[in-house]
Amino acid sequence: MGAGAVLGFISVFGAGLLAGEELVIRYGVRGPLGRLDQEPHIRMRQGLIRTLRILVPAILAPTLLSAVAVTVVDGADGGLALRCAAILALLAWVTVTLRGTVPINEAALDWDPAAPPGNWRALVDRWENLNFVRAWLAIGAFALLLAGLLS
């Protein structure tokens, strides 16, 4: 197995983990979390933020780096356009995360669950809208990297 195959596997595996994590947060956690009363909702959200702000970058970094590396190593083979599109999707995911959800998450960590800011629901709604975009960017990146590996 050559370097390109190993890097391709790492990128697809990581993208699959990222897409799965985003899919579960968007379509598995979101509904039950939204039905909780204010205090348990905020406590659960804060717990998720504390956990995922470590886990998600640990998945993203090797995924993005290996996607770039396999693109360089394999060059202009049949999967080049697909891998480039996947890298753009991952970079868009990073942009939405850093400019959108991270500032909301940082603010949410300081909320008092018994007395959150008056606009906390609006901030959660904004986060949910951004998360929809993030989830589908991650899913798209996974599909593109997988297709690139198979081409």
Predicted segment positions?
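Helix-coil boundary and interhelical linker segments in multi-pass alpha-helical membrane proteins
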Residues: 1-10, 71-82, 144-151
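Core segments of transmembrane alpha-helices
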Residues: 57-70, 134-142
